[in-house]
Amino acid sequence: MNDAVITLNGLEKRFPGMDKPAVAPLDCTIHAGYVTGLVGPDGAGKTTLMRMLAGLLKPDSGSATVIGFDPIKNDGALHAVLGYMPQKFGLYEDLTVMENLNLYADLRSVTGEARKQTFARLLEFTSLGPFTGRLAGKLSGGMKQKLGLACTLVGEPKVLLLDEPGVGVDPISRRELWQMVHELAGEGMLILWSTSYLDEAEQCRDVLLMNEGELLYQGEPKALTQTMAGRSFLMTSPHEGNRKLLQRALKLPQVSDGMIQGKSVRLILKKEATPDDIRHADGMPEININETTPRFEDAFIDLLGGAGTSESPLGAILHTVEGTPGETVIEAKELTKKFGDFAATDHVNFAVKRGEIFGLLGPNGAGKSTTFKMMCGLLVPTSGQALVLGMDLKESSGKARQHLGYMAQKFSLYGNLTVEQNLRFFSGVYGLRGRAQNEKISRMSEAFGLKSIASHATDELPLGFKQRLALACSLMHEPDILFLDEPTSGVDPLTRREFWLHINSMVEKGVTVMVTTHFMDEAEYCDRIGLVYRGKLIASGTPDDLKAQSANDEQPDPTMEQAFIQLIHDWDKEHSNE
């Protein structure tokens, strides 16, 4: 076993104007030979800790040693043996894959035969060999992360710090990244992987769980998960849909957390609560409730004190959408988009009914985003039709867009404007003026908890507040249809739950939602899902339908992520001769 370690002794970091330290005095030891996960919600202190370990931030008190080096006093020696991949890794998008590798090799002084051998090993390791001449900007999200990892590994570091490398990456690419990182750890490298995705944390041998700068837990994820035995349940009702059932359950004092899981509601009960407490609670309909296997996420949420929010205030301020329940409001007919001879979307067909949440899933580069952009009028189809409320977006885009709300990936907010200025700008774009505009800004600010930060520059906001603001901006004109492009990418489970409470309350009002996501637990909130691969719609149905389609002897009860990977594997096998 490699004896490389990170040791923290009372390590603390404070920033001016903050009541609490970004990282409270922290004592722990991190070993090599396996992947250690750094887990916590937005603002927990994960990135601050990473930056101190990399020597990019000076601690206010305490000390850290990284394989024997002080990150500040011995920065030169440390940087020779440390690889750090930040959230926004510095790839040069106008350079090719090989040109990026050459640049990082120059920076690391890797030359001659050593460079040649290193590149050969990394290109094989990352499967990027066939793409050395491709511009980095033209790579899919998963391939960019692999290239970022390859560039970080050019100098053959002994310590690897990865800050949320799985954000925006599809399940197949994430699995490949994990296989690569586990292989490196097995060779004796010390690896610290920061994440807000708790399914990733479950793959770590050891985790550090932080919240508000404090270390709440260090140990095996499995050990923390086992503390939740007898407290995780799946609930259904023959008389009520899962969204309404979730709203009722979250108001009960016996419930610590709840979320939609396919056709069921997943509940975490407080320590002394029993299923009978839920069955006999006031206002609950007839239910079926059965114990299920706990997950690390259940333990994480419980350790943080539960989900906290039980109801979205949006339901009280949004109007009910007029229209016939069950009528088709979004439709793709033989939808095709070609770039030269390449068909990014190839004769795709689907229909979305009023008041439904429809999810588009697919690997990076599969055509999912192209399809989504055509459906909300951001791309013109080569052939076929994208219809919204019966209107062809190619012919009636202006009229159709009056009924659409769009929340872009990475939120598309104006960072140099304040929160209120963003709300004023977007409401103005949607035609609101004067008193009506002021009232809508006030109501949305109240609903999303933005009033106290109205004068803050948007660039300075934590990710969770940016997400709230982006959703508020997209709802200023109270659209009938809402398009969400990876709306919770990189946010923590608490923020994700709050977001979906808002979405569920809107759907109860008749709003139709179309969403793209790489986060498979999020797909469970969808009524139906379309899986796009190689430009084609290869599967569609409810989350439970897709899981049933992918079930086999090895995986009789697959997760949504396992179903995603299996359905693509099955399609590849079936079309291997084409």
Curated annotation (Swiss-Prot):
Listed PROSITE patterns: ABC_TRANSPORTER_1, ABC_TRANSPORTER_2
Claim: Membrane is one of the keywords in the record: no
UniProt domain ABC transporter: residue ranges: 6-237, 330-559
Pfam families assigned: ABC_tran
Function: Part of the ABC transporter complex YbhFSR that could be involved in efflux of cefoperazone. Probably responsible for energy coupling to the transport system.
Subunit text: The complex is probably composed of two ATP-binding proteins (YbhF) and two transmembrane proteins (YbhR and YbhS).
Name of protein: Probable multidrug ABC transporter ATP-binding protein YbhF
Biological source species: Escherichia coli (strain K12)
Gene name in the database record: ybhF
